[in-house]
């Protein structure tokens, strides 16, 4: 099995399923995590080209997770429905995408960050 190139961290099940489908239909290999604890475990076990993290998680902070992923060499995208409340400096460290997002907007950002799926193999 090919190693996943994207880690998607989203606590809301419907949003997670939709985003995962958009990414896999576009040819990306995706791992998912619904909590910060699961995300940390996945980050310890594998390297990802891109980590997409929801900012507000029930057990942690998606920005903190994105910071850790970036320190390991991953590109990062923070998604949030609370753009005006993001901590100062977040946009200088991570790409930001407002929720809800259109599939084509998500894919445009992902392609800009890591290229197409064939570019990752």
What are these regions (language model features)?
Residues 7, 32-50:
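Acidic, metal-coordinating helix/loop segments flanking the phosphotransfer/catalytic sites
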Residues 10:
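Conserved acidic carboxylate
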Residues 13-31:
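Two-component/phosphorelay signaling modules centered on CheY-like receiver
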Residues 35, 61-64:
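Acidic catalytic/metal-coordinating carboxylates
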Residues 54:
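Active-site residues of response regulator receiver
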Residues 58:
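The feature encodes the CheY-like receiver
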Residues 79-80:
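Hydrophobic/aromatic residues positioned on beta-strands within the core alpha/beta folds
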Residues 101-121:
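C-terminal output helix
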């Amino acid at each position: 099995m090919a190693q996943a190139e994207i880690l998607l961290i989203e606590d809301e099940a419907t949003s997670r399923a939709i985003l995962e489908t958009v990414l896999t239909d576009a040819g990306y290999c995706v791992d998912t995590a619904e909590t910060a604890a699961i995300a940390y475990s996945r980050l310890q076990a594998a390297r990802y080209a891109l980590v997409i993290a929801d900012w507000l998680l029930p057990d942690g902070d998606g920005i903190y997770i994105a910071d850790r992923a970036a320190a390991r060499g991953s590109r990062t995208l923070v998604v949030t429905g609370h753009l005006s409340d993001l901590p100062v400096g977040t946009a200088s460290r991570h790409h930001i995408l407002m929720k809800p997002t259109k599939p084509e907007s998500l894919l445009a950002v992902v392609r800009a960050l890591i290229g197409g799926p064939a570019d990752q193999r």
